[in-house]
């Protein structure tokens, strides 16, 4: 990757994923100001990174401490929180490194800068793959909960969930190494784009199936006698599905501009309009970090148990039932 592309900026970016050819003359643009690289202060990245780290650490602590949250879905949420922490940590460290280099307080060799640049990019890519895989795992967990409710506890045990999480992170680590090895190849970008759209399509299919089933179930309940009510377990399952749907929607909203950026790099690297769009890369990076900040808020908003555990941890209460 071209470290000069990254470290000449005052805010972090993925070099290979953000670099684009020199912009055309102003006469060929829709507006020279619109095509200029967006400047975002390093403090913004650091603030988002710190807030995200604190929030996601709180999520993991809450699940670990509260025995009532020791279920496959919450362990998958912990893994998703770890992925959010990784992208925040990567961007924060890269921001600090860029600030140090720009201040001339340390003299670093180009080879070291290149190496660190690849590591930061690899961390973000690992976080992306881990987020996608964990969201897919949660979607499958909710699918099994709804369609195989009576067999759920034998199909999806805590041990199986933890094993799956371990496999996910091992695969993500391998992907991270491959990203570094093939950092100069555009196939890395193609693989990321393909994985993103394939996973989104698969998860979308699962959720459409789940909500069509829920709609059919509600229609059947409506024709039953007054005694026929929705079982609490069924209501809980659908609530969990809604929560994960919200998470998926936020994920797509925050990451889609970044992936459009990648698509434009591949398909129209010299088009003036594409160049104008890719010039706003730092904005898309801020959106990615915002996703890491928003996710824990969704957990807290949708789960009373998790929200109460947050309060107990923040208040320093030690009367938690460890289950």
UniProtKB/Swiss-Prot annotation:
Q: Which residues are glycosylated?
A: 2, 16, 28
- GO annotation, cellular component aspect: plasma membrane
Family matches, as InterPro entries: GPCR_Rhodpsn, GPCR_Rhodpsn_7TM, MC3-5R, Mcort_3_rcpt, Melcrt_ACTH_rcpt
Kindly list the residue ranges recorded as spanning the membrane: 38-63, 76-100, 119-140, 161-181, 187-210, 246-268, 278-301
Query: Where is the protein found, in the record's own terms?
Result: Cell membrane
Membrane topology for this entry?
Answer: Multi-pass membrane protein
Instruction: Name the major location.
Output: membrane
Gene Ontology biological process terms, A to Z: adenylate cyclase-activating G protein-coupled receptor signaling pathway; circadian regulation of gene expression; homoiothermy; locomotor rhythm; regulation of blood pressure; regulation of feeding behavior; regulation of heart rate; sodium ion homeostasis
Q: What is this protein called?
A: Melanocortin receptor 3
Organism for this UniProt entry:
Mus musculus
